[in-house]
Design a protein with these regions (language model features):
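Short, charge-rich amphipathic interface segments used for partner binding and complex assembly
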Residues: 125-143
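Low-complexity, small/polar and acidic-rich linker and loop segments
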Residues: 73-82
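Short, charge/polar-rich alpha-helical segments
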Residues: 2-9, 85-103
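Charged, low-complexity interaction regions
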Residues: 3, 20-30, 41, 73, ...
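Short terminal alpha-helical segments
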Residues: 2-66, 72
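Intrinsic-disorder/low-complexity loop/linker signature
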Residues: 38-40, 81-82, 89
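Intrinsic-disorder-driven secretion/translocation and chaperone-binding regions of pathogen effectors
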Residues: 7, 14, 66, 94, ...
């Protein structure tokens, strides 16, 4: 782990108290529509408006994940096959994070971004399932 990555971890962990607040809402899903020239309501595909702290998280985590492949196997993986590709994003259960290594957390964060690219709201779902917080707590455990 180099100094740049440790600084990236510190910057991510600065956000953890906000994410742990019981009142924290990672995103809202406003109605998206417009009224056309004929007065007809036109619905839009929904997408979230993320909390500013989530947007900051999305700006900060790339400094930590640079250089990790999202699907290749890591030596510490349970199987030699790596992560199965999924257009909707790969996800893990809560137990995964209790033992995850730094590279497994880095890969998870990389996959968060990939999941969001192909599925608006993926990051919201991972926050609501408390997986992002679990990943950050594991980082804190390993590096603080």
């Amino acid at each position: 782990m180099d100094a740049t990555q440790i600084a990236a971890i510190d910057r991510l962990l600065e956000l953890l108290p906000t994410f742990e607040d019981p009142e924290f809402v990672p995103a809202v899903w406003p109605e998206r529509f417009h009224i056309d020239a004929e007065g007809k309501r036109i619905e839009h595909v929904p997408y979230p408006d993320y909390h500013p702290a989530v947007e900051e998280f999305r700006n900060r985590y790339p400094a930590l994940v640079a250089g990790i492949h999202p699907y290749d196997a890591l030596p510490e993986d349970d199987t030699p096959d790596g992560v199965t590709f999924s257009v909707l994003g790969t996800t893990y259960d809560q137990a995964y994070f209790a033992k995850a290594t730094i590279d497994q957390i880095r890969r998870y964060l990389m996959l968060l971004g990939r999941g969001e690219r192909f599925c608006d709201g993926h990051i919201d779902g991972e926050f609501r399932a408390e997986k992002v917080v679990a990943a950050l707590k594991r980082l804190a455990e390993m590096y603080r």
